[in-house]
Design a protein with these regions (language model features):
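Glycoside hydrolase catalytic-domain context in secreted enzymes
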Residues: 1-367, 447-512
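Long, intrinsically disordered low-complexity tandem-repeat segments
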Residues: 368-372, 376-379, 384-430, 434-436, ...
């Protein structure tokens, strides 16, 4: 590819068009110039490419893919080699669906335990997060797919993430909040970085010269592409000045703003050409990927291996290893409908799903389970169900809020898992409760579950900022206020449409 020749043939309008999305997931192509479209797709622990047209968010409507353990689980393995193997599998699946840029891994530091996307991030340890992220990046990019580390930087909470300001002194910023990104860039060789929604020390991350120019480009030597988080562009011209090459998704105002800025002398056309040069280099790299089918069962087996190697056994009171013939009671909704991932932009529609129920069924006759349906998580109900527990030697407790709160796949999956059964690994086995114990009073409603936290936040915070699963979709659309200002987003369950529209109008950061 003769990049300089291509750039010399481009008009100012074409240059401006190349620096913003064509639709929700892809960049604009220019067949007459030999420039192809790039397709970007979630996500950190599994591909989330939607099944229909590309001009919508597509949550819960994605093509089935392997759901690997989330980053929060994988960090418990401390296994870089395993992380790189998962990265390779992610790269293979992305290439099979002709995805050029995989939006992950995420490695923001876990500063607040209530951050709704903590499951997407590795650790509160910047060194561990960086090493695991670098391994993922190497694996993904070995398959000709670019990895996009996110969210740069200090995006450590979801509450009001579009307008919040992370005020951090320089040493803390570099040693804690940026160290993981530095490792992913220098050791992993990440081709892309996604800028965050929030401000850092008073300036939005997507137009922050200290972050994007002085640290990322000059100090770390990053020569790849910086892309905005979806709807995270505050000022397109200022973003370009700082080296933010690509605004996503498409925005009709961006092209006009860039052209006007060049014509008025507020930005040099050569700066656009520098950004285009990086995008062409990214296109050249991803053009090498091999679009071919992958082995779904092998990838699911790898996901199970990763889950086993990441499991942490907190205590074993003589229960493990299980002996042949042991009868096990499966207690709790998650044994049958597990929460194996979070919600939002990273949700994966899995090709296969291994549940405790299926695993125990596949291990018969060595082991046998005495419960064929979930027993409520309430201790009182467990004790009042002697038929479910009294005949068992052990109880596997899968505590949850309720099965209705679990994330379930949106399309049918294969239920056959017997061929993939291996050694049972569990960190939650315990002896059955004594049935002679005195009756327990029902547990008080305290904010220990997600649902309780949601109710508390709904009462404490303004409408639509409750942080529920639907609210995350709301937060994203709120960031693209200039596109959905009329209220074209889906409101969360904590509000009605009228409140939603007013909230969008009051917090949207888009141009009027």
């Amino acid at each position: 590819m003769d990049k300089e020749k291509i750039i010399s043939q481009m008009t100012l309008e074409e240059k401006a068009e190349m620096l913003t999305g064509k639709d929700f997931w892809s960049t604009k192509d220019f067949p007459n110039l030999g420039i192809r479209s790039l397709f970007l797709s979630d996500g950190p622990h599994g591909l989330r490419k939607q099944a229909a047209a590309s001009d919508h968010l597509g949550l819960n409507a994605s093509i089935p893919a392997t759901c690997f353990p989330t980053a929060s689980v994988m960090a418990c393995s401390w296994d870089e080699e395993l992380g790189e193997r998962i990265g390779e599998a992610l790269g293979e699946e992305a290439a099979a669906l002709n995805v050029d840029v995989l939006l992950g891994p995420g490695l923001n530091i876990k500063r607040n335990p209530l951050c709704g996307r903590n499951f997407e991030y590795f650790s509160e340890d910047p060194y561990l997060a960086g090493k695991m992220a670098a391994a993922y990046v190497r694996g993904i990019q070995s398959k000709g797919v670019a990895a996009c580390v996110k969210h740069f930087a200090a995006n450590n909470r979801e509450y009001r993430r579009m307008t919040s300001d992370s005020v951090i002194d320089e040493r803390t910023l570099r040693e804690i909040y940026l160290r993981g990104f530095e490792i992913a860039v220098k050791e992993g060789g990440a081709k892309c970085v996604m800028s965050a929604y929030n401000k850092v020390n008073g300036e939005f991350a997507n137009e922050n010269p200290h972050l994007l120019k002085e640290i990322l480009r000059e100090d770390w030597g990053f020569n790849g592409v910086v892309v905005t988080d979806w709807g995270g562009c505050n000022d397109r011209v200022d973003g370009l000045k700082c080296g933010n090459e690509l605004e996503m998704p498409a925005c009709k105002y961006a092209v006009e703003d860039v052209i006007t800025a060049v014509e008025e002398g507020r930005i040099e056309e050569s700066l656009l050409e520098e950004s285009i040069r990086r995008l062409l280099e990214l296109s050249e790299f991803t053009a090498r990927k091999q679009v071919r089918a992958y082995d779904e069962r092998a990838h699911h087996a790898l996901a199970r291996e990763a889950a086993e190697k990441s499991a942490v056994l907190l205590e074993n009171d003589g229960i493990l290893p299980l002996k042949a013939g042991t009868r096990v009671a499966l207690v709790g909704d998650f044994a049958f409908l597990p929460r194996y991932q979070g919600a939002g932009s990273s949700v994966v529609n899995p090709t296969f799903l291994s549940t405790a129920e299926k695993v125990f069924a596949s291990l018969r006759p060595s082991l046998s389970s005495s419960v064929s349906k979930p027993v409520s998580d309430s201790s009182a109900e467990i004790l009042s169900s002697p038929d479910s527990v009294s005949s068992s030697d052990s109880a596997l407790s899968s505590v949850s809020m309720s099965s209705s709160d679990s994330v379930s796949p949106s399309v049918s999956m294969s239920s056959s898992d017997s061929a993939l059964s291996s050694d049972l690994v569990s960190s939650s086995l315990s002896a059955p409760p004594s049935l002679s114990a005195p009756p327990l009073s029902p547990a008080p409603s305290v904010p220990l579950s997600v649902s309780s936290f949601r109710k508390k936040e709904q009462e404490t915070f303004p409408p639509c900022l409750a942080g529920c699963g639907e609210g995350r979709s709301y937060s994203l659309f709120r960031g693209i206020g200039r596109i959905f200002r009329s209220g074209g987003h889906r409101p969360c369950r904590h509000e009605d449409s009228a409140k939603s529209n007013r909230a969008v109008q009051s917090v949207g950061r888009g141009r009027k």
